[in-house]
UniProtKB/Swiss-Prot annotation:
Protein's UniProt keywords contain Zinc-finger: no
A GO biological-process term: nucleotide metabolic process
Sorted UniProt keywords: Cytoplasm, Hydrolase, Nucleotide metabolism
Record SUPFAM superfamilies: ITPase-like
Protein origin, superkingdom: Bacteria
Family named by the database record: Belongs to the Maf family.
Keyword Cytoplasm attributed: yes
EC class of the enzyme, as a word: hydrolase
Cofactor requirements of the protein: a divalent metal cation
Annotated Gene Ontology cellular component terms: cytoplasm
Species this chain originates from: Nitratiruptor sp. (strain SB155-2)
Record's protein name: Nucleoside triphosphate pyrophosphatase
Record InterPro entries: ITPase-like_fam (IPR029001), Maf-like (IPR003697)
Length: 185
């Protein structure tokens, strides 16, 4: 049994599909302040995951091992955050259209004996997005709450030309690596 320090439905589904028993426990951590300090996406995502882990340990303790994670989307090392509105979502998606997009996830596992930090990157090469299709996606609102306004399992799927890496990383949790770490639980 592990404690997933996240409200993400996608991360919870990944754990369910992998057969890892868990309880989902949200934590309050504002990662926006970190953007002022960390410009490199890899440094930022690890700092955010560490912040979430610290908040989870403080709130819940380590009676149950904890997993915390953060994911960012980046194009040419520019961090693409969650869009605040439709216009920002359009700009973010236009940067991804026809480009290589890195989805970077830092996952941290912590129990009473050990802490394991795992950084993984999945890269997608996208074909240019169709303007009408993009407009329909924006109107649907499905981009809300998504890092980089990106849904590789939804809107972006048909534009994928090439994938380098694991789908689970792109979805926010390296469950294959977590299963190795937590196999004794």
């Amino acid at each position: 049994m592990i404690r997933l320090a996240s409200t993400s439905e996608t991360r919870a589904k990944l754990l369910q599909d992998t057969g890892i028993e868990f309880i989902q426990s949200p934590v309050d951590f504002d990662e926006e302040e970190l953007l002022k300090v960390y410009k490199n996406p890899r440094d930022f995502v690890c700092a955010a995951a560490r912040g979430k882990m610290e908040a989870a340990v403080e709130k819940y303790g380590l009676e149950i091992p904890i997993v915390a994670a953060d994911t960012v989307v980046a194009v040419s090392d520019e961090i693409l955050r969650k869009a605040k509105d439709e216009e920002e979502a359009r700009k973010i998606l236009q940067k991804q259209s026809g480009n290589k997009v890195d989805i970077i996830t830092c996952m941290i596992y912590k129990d009473k004996e050990k802490t394991v930090e795992d950084l993984d990157v999945t890269s997608y090469i996208f074909a240019p997005f169709d303007e009408e299709d993009l407009q329909n996606y924006l109107k649907s609102g499905q981009w809300r709450g998504k890092a980089g306004a990106c849904m590789v399992e939804g809107f972006c799927k048909k534009y994928i030309k090439e994938v380098l890496g694991r789908e689970s990383t792109a979805m926010g949790l390296q469950v294959e690596r977590l299963a190795e770490i937590a196999k004794d639980l």
